Every structure is written in C-alpha cells, then in structure tokens.
C-alpha cells in the first residue's frame, strides 16, 4: 500500500490494490501512474500481463473521482485557455501544429529539430486555396529535411500520406509513402524554392534558382482544399521566407509570395492553441473517461479491473459501464440514462451509441486506446480520429483532455502517426523495447514435410477435417502437385497436434489457429478423439474462442479454460489479443502468424511469473494454399478457391519464409525437433517441468560450482593474507616512527 501511496495514489485505491496482493508496482505502473496523475499524455508499451491495465486504470479512476468530488463541492477550475489568434495574423510556422521535438524561433521562421532518431514536422499558420504561390527555404546545416505542401488532414511526417507533397535533401520526392528520384540533392547553404499552382494542380521545386521541373500533379479531389507550408526535420535547421524579405531567387511565370496572397484565398489554420471547452452542465450519458478495447473479452477484463480498483472509492461512488456488441443494448441504454462516469467498450457498439446521440462525448476527460496497434490493424483509424474530433480539448474546469495509448509496440508506423494527430506532447514509456524471447520460454519448430513423412497417405478419412480449399482438386496420394502437398500438410498438422499433446502429457495449452474455420475444425477433431467442450478433464477437452461464437459462449469458454475445467483453448490471434491467462505451460502454433510481432505475442503467453513454458510451432516445408477472404462477406458462404490475383479468396502461404523473417526479427535461430516432437534437455536448465517455477540452479550449474569451489577458497585465503600483511605493515611503520 505504501509503495502505491508514494506515487500519489489515493488510500482507497491503494487499499484495493493491496487486497489484490500487489505489494509493489510493476515497472510500467511505476513509470506511467505519476505521469498520468500529473496531467500528461502517455504512450506506453509493455507485455501482456505486465500490469499495463492497472497503469492507466488507477490514475484514471483517481482523477475522475477528484473531478466529481470538486463538482460536488462546487469547486471550479480556470476555464480560460490561451489562444493563438495573434500568431495566426501573420505568415509563420505554427507553434500549435508541430512535433514534440520541433523548435520555432521567436521570428516564427527559423525552425530546428535536434532529434537524431525520429522525424519531427510542422505546418504554417496560414494556407491558400486558390492561385499560384512561392516560398523559399534556406538550409542552415547538413541535417535531413523534407519541405513542401500539405493539407491540415496530413501527418506532420510530410510525404507519408496522400495529403502531403514533399522534396527531401536526398534528392527524393515523397507522397503517400512513395519516394521517387527527383531533381538533385541539397544541403547546407542551399536555397529551395517551393511552388504551388492550385489552379493547374501543380507542385514543383527549385534549387538555388534552378527549376527542377514538375514534381506532383495534385489529385482532382484535393483541388478545393487549402494547402499549408510544411516541413519535417531530423537533426536539421531551416529558415523560411514567405516574402516579407526579398527572395534570393524571385519566382517567375506569375507565381507570387505567400505573404502577398489575397485575403480571399487565405485560410487560417484550425490548430490555434485553443480548443472547444466542454459544457459545465453534467449530463447522465456523458462519461468522464472512455476506454476503447479491440475485443469483447479484453473490454470485460478491463472493466473487472476498474471494479476492483474502485472498490473503496466512495462519496461520490463511480459508475462504470461496459458497452460491447453482441448483447442487447437495452440494459446499456438504461444504465446510460441513469448516469455513468467510466465507459469501457469496443468500437462498433460505441460508434452506434455516439451516432444516435445515446452516448455523449461532451465531458470526456480521458480517452484511452488499449492495444492501439490492434485497433488500427482492424481498421478503426477513422473511428478514432472521428471521436477524437468530437471530444472537447478542454474540460469545463480548465483541464486538458488526456489521451493514453497502450500498444504492444510503439515502433509501429501507424501508432506513431496516430500519436502525432491526437496526442499533446506525449511521454513515451517503452518498457518492451525490441522483441525478444524470455529465458523462461523454450520455443521449438517442428518441420511438417509431407514428402518425407508419408503418414498422411494411410489415414484415409480418419484425419482432421481440412478447410475445403482443395475440395475441387485432385489430392489423392501418389500425385506430385503443389495441391497434393498442401492438403497433406493440413492433414499432418492435425496428427502432429495430437502427437505433441500425448508426448508432453499436456494438461493445459493455448492452440493458435490461423482462421476461425481452422479453430472449428480443430475442435471437431478433438471431439473425434473423445474430447471436446463437454468432456471435463478428458485428455482432449477443449473450448473455442473466436469472433463467430456468440459473446456469452466466448465468455463462458474463457472462464472454463481459466478454471482448468478444460485443457485446451483453441483460438485466433484477434480473439486472444491482450487477454491475460496466467500459468499456461504450453502454446502450440498450428500455423505461423503472418506478422512476426504476433509470434512473440503468442509464445509470450507462456513463461510468465518465472514459470517455464514451451511453445511448439508447426512449420510446413512446402507452400500451403489457405483462405484469404477479400469478399464482402468476409468468408461467410464463400467457396471461391481461386487465387486472390485471379479474383478468388485464397493465397499460397509460405511458412519457411515467415520463419526466416521471425528468426531475423529475433536475431536467433529457433531450434528444430523431429516429427516425434521430443524436446531435448536444455544444456543449462536440464530437465524442465513446464508450468513450474524455474529451478534456481539446475543442469550443469551445480557441477560448475563444484569446479570453481577450490579456486574460490584459494582466493579467500589470499585475500585474508593480503589484509593481514597490510595491517602488520602499518603496525611496524608506527613502531619504527616512535623509535626515532
């Protein structure tokens, strides 16, 4: 309790935390809680199970409580907000529209960023929507930079999306992440001219007066948008000239200085340093905190944590609500009408309630995006930007909206791009760093080679039901086509799963399948083995977890697995994202994930709390044809087995290539075992019991100590002798001095 109290956590929350046996904060909690309590935006990355949910839930609960308490007692903060209206009255770079490490001089024209690892950008205070315009940029050093034009919808990282057009010092033009050769390189003492002809949809550049020719043709759908001066720097310094001073290389052909643009063609930036202030009157359906999760299970897990942390928070009590799809909305609407302070939910249902006016964002103080990389990969970028735009940036008591983003990795381009748009000078708390495999996890690869292991030819119809990709192909034994080997791989993988379970006498494991259909087929195969959902305690008892299962069934299945009522949880990556299941000794990858980061996420399910874990990956030696639905139904009722490039919904999946990418990512070679799946003893750990704590000393370590023991004893004797000699020498010196 004292450890959390020292970080400023209120006693009521600290008491609840203590009852959860959290004696000390985890690393992510120790770093993030003070930052959030201090009012800052925070980007945090840590492994699942590291206490990440507590890192944002605890401060959110406390600040929401303090806000409600102040309202209850009639206290009001200062709602005055500094505006940038005076800044917008002249052409200069905008201090309210820049990266966190981007500095602007007092004149508004000299710009600098000394960040050497990341790009930081900025836009001007004003833009233009009609006419032909020109400005100059002088390079003051040899750093990297891109200059050009962009709309307010663009990322500050100029040229990495479809709303910006840039020209870089390496002699590349950039638009929508496409970097092409253009003009020539430029560096210190060079002057770059930036031309914009909106009427003819042209962007071009010059170097020291030399016209470099057409760079971009502006798409027709952008013709009526306002374009702003833009740049992005990496350890560089530039100075802009919008025409208030004489140009070094005056433009020709009717181009005029931006500062001379007619008022009717000038558009002021919306990024003014001020913001919409939330209304003072409280609404029952207007929560103070909105926490968005990528899945129902993760939303339920987070809500349970919130309930635990707020257990002793009273006067006023906090009211929380879970908003997820797949369940009746009537009860959720009733709770909303009665009043709610913290909302936890998934994007679909939250979006529905916002669009119908049932959920108000007018008083949101906290916006939390948990597993942000998962939200973005599921296509919720527009949803996030849309709701962010509806939330007042300043609360009625004068506090700024706080945005907290949690992600498996902060090195994702999309996460960085999102943070630039919706966060205010965020602090990065990255305790995950580069992906690595914990010492408590043994991970091995089992090659699945149908050309060597002919077992599949003898199984007749007793094998696992396959996904139907080859139902129209001739895959009978004796053939030598890619389709034959692909179908054989699917059959062998089912047999290898059963073999692995029996070989290691697995009592609990998570089995990752690539698709929902694969999960269903694996569950059915376990039923064939005598197991399944209804066979509690059976060697092949199992439950399924994926988005096609109804929410009550998913919740029930997850609880049964956590309580060890069944041995195996068969699931997809999306369904299992972020769910914290402790003490699982085994993970089996039926198919390698197509994103290398997901491999680390999967095998990270084992080896937690210092318990040993084994991750087994089945890797096909040949390419496997698999479903890859691009149809509108997303696979429901789809039997189009043609390849994607031929208008179908299948691809050839190359697991050997994926394995090499994973090994390169982890900078290690993953051990391979034979198809009998016997894992040899580890040289250091010796015999390991997976699911148990790692032995403090094991394997060869004890013998190593015995070998070193005589040497250590000799060193101790020498140390004693040296110290005795030193003391004796000091005594003799004193006696000698006295004799004189």
Swiss-Prot record:
Region span, Interaction with dsRNA: 1-448
Reactions performed catalytically: ATP + H2O = ADP + phosphate + H(+)
GO molecular function: ATP binding; ATP hydrolysis activity; chromatin binding; DNA binding; DNA/RNA helicase activity; exonuclease activity; mRNA binding; nuclease activity
CDD domains: DEADc_DDX1, SF2_C_DEAD, SPRY_DDX1
UniProt keyword list: Activator, ATP-binding, Cytoplasm, DNA-binding, Exonuclease, Helicase, Hydrolase, Mitochondrion, mRNA processing, Nuclease, Nucleotide-binding, Nucleus, RNA-binding, Transcription, Transcription regulation, tRNA processing
One BP annotation, GO: tRNA splicing, via endonucleolytic cleavage and ligation
Alphabetical list of SMART domains matching this protein: DEXDc, HELICc, SPRY
Positions bound to ATP: 46-53
InterPro entries named in the record: B30.2/SPRY, B30.2/SPRY_sf, ConA-like_dom_sf, DEAD/DEAH_box_helicase_dom, Helicase_ATP-bd, Helicase_C-like, P-loop_NTPase, RNA_helicase_DEAD_Q_motif
Organism, as annotated: Xenopus laevis
PROSITE patterns membership: B302_SPRY, HELICASE_ATP_BIND_1, HELICASE_CTER, Q_MOTIF
Leading EC class: hydrolase
Record family assignment: Belongs to the DEAD box helicase family. DDX1 subfamily.
Name this protein carries in UniProt: ATP-dependent RNA helicase DDX1
């Amino acid at each position: 309790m004292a450890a959390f109290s020292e970080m400023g956590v209120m006693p009521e929350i600290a008491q609840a935390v203590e009852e959860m046996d959290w004696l000390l904060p985890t690393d992510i909690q120790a770093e993030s809680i003070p930052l959030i309590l201090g009012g800052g935006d925070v980007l945090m990355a840590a492994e699942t199970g590291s206490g990440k949910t507590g890192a944002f839930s605890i401060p959110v609960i406390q600040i929401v409580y303090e806000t409600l308490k102040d309202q209850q007692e009639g206290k009001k903060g200062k709602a005055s907000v500094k505006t940038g209206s005076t800044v917008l009255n002249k052409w200069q770079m905008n201090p309210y529209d820049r990266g966190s490490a981007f500095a602007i001089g007092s004149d508004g024209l000299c710009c600098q960023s000394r960040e050497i690892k990341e790009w930081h950008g900025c836009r001007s205070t004003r833009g233009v929507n009609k006419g032909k315009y020109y400005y100059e940029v002088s390079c003051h050093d040899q750093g990297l930079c891109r200059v050009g034009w962009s709309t307010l919808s663009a990322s500050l990282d100029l040229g990495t999306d479809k709303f910006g057009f840039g020209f870089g010092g390496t002699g590349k033009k950039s638009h929508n992440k496409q970097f092409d050769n253009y003009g020539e390189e430029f560096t210190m003492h060079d002057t770059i001219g930036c031309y914009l002809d909106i009427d003819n949809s042209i962007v071009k550049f010059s170097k020291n007066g030399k016209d470099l020719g057409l760079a971009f043709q502006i798409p027709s759908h952008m013709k009526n948008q306002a374009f702003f001066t833009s740049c992005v720097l990496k350890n560089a310094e530039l100075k802009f000239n919008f025409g208030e001073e004489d140009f070094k290389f005056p433009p020709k052909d009717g181009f005029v200085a931006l500062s001379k643009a007619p008022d009717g063609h000038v558009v002021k930036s919306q990024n003014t340093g001020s913001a919409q202030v939330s209304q003072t009157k409280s609404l029952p359906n207007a929560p103070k905190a909105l926490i968005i999760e990528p899945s129902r299970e993760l939303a339920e897990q987070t809500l349970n944590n919130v309930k635990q942390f707020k257990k002793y928070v009273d006067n006023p009590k906090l009211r929380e609500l879970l908003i997820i799809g797949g369940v009746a909305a009537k009860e959720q609407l009733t709770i909303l009408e009665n009043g709610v302070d913290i909302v936890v939910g998934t994007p679909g249902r939250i979006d529905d309630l916002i669009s119908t006016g049932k959920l108000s964002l007018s008083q949101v103080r906290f916006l939390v995006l948990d597993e942000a990389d998962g939200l973005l990969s599921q296509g919720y970028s527009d949803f996030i930007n849309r709701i962010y735009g509806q939330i007042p940036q300043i609360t009625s008591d004068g506090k700024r909206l706080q945005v907290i983003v949690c992600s498996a990795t902060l090195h994702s381009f999309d996460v960085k791009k999102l943070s630039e748009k919706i966060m205010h000078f965020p602090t990065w708390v990255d305790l995950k760093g580069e992906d690595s495999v914990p010492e408590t996890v043994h991970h091995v690869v089992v090659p699945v080679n149908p050309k060597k292991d002919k077992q599949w030819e003898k199984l007749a119809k007793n094998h696992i039901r396959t996904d139907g990709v080859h139902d129209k192909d001739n895959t009978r034994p004796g053939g030598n086509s890619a389709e034959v080997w692909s179908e054989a791989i699917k059959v062998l993988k089912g047999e290898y799963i059963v073999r692995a379970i029996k070989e290691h006498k697995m009592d609990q494991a998570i089995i990752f399948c690539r698709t929902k259909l694969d999960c269903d087929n694996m569950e059915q195969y376990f039923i064939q083995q005598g197991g399944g959902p209804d066979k509690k305690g059976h060697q092949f008892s199992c439950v399924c977890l994926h988005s096609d299962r109804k929410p009550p069934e998913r919740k029930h299945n997850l609880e049964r697995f956590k309580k060890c009522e069944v041995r195996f949880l068969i699931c997809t990556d999306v369904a299992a994202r972020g769910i914290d299941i402790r003490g699982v000794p085994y993970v089996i990858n039926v198919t390698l994930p197509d994103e290398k980061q997901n491999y680390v996420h999967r095998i990270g399910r084992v080896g937690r709390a210092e318990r040993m874990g084994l991750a087994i990956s089945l890797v096909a030696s040949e390419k496997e044809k698999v479903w890859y639905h691009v149809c509108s139904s997303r696979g429901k009722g789809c039997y189009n087995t043609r390849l994607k490039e031929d208008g179908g919904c299948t691809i050839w999946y190359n697991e050997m290539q994926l394995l090499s990418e994973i090994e390169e990512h982890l900078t290690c070679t993953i051990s391979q075992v034979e198809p009998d799946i016997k894992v040899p003893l580890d040289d250091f750990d010796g015999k390991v019991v997976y699911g148990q704590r790692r032995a403090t000393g094991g394997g060869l370590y004890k013998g190593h100590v015995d070998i070193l023991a005589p040497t250590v004893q000799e060193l101790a004797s020498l140390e004693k002798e040296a110290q005795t000699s030193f003391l004796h020498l000091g005594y003799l010196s004193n006696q000698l001095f006295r004799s004189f």
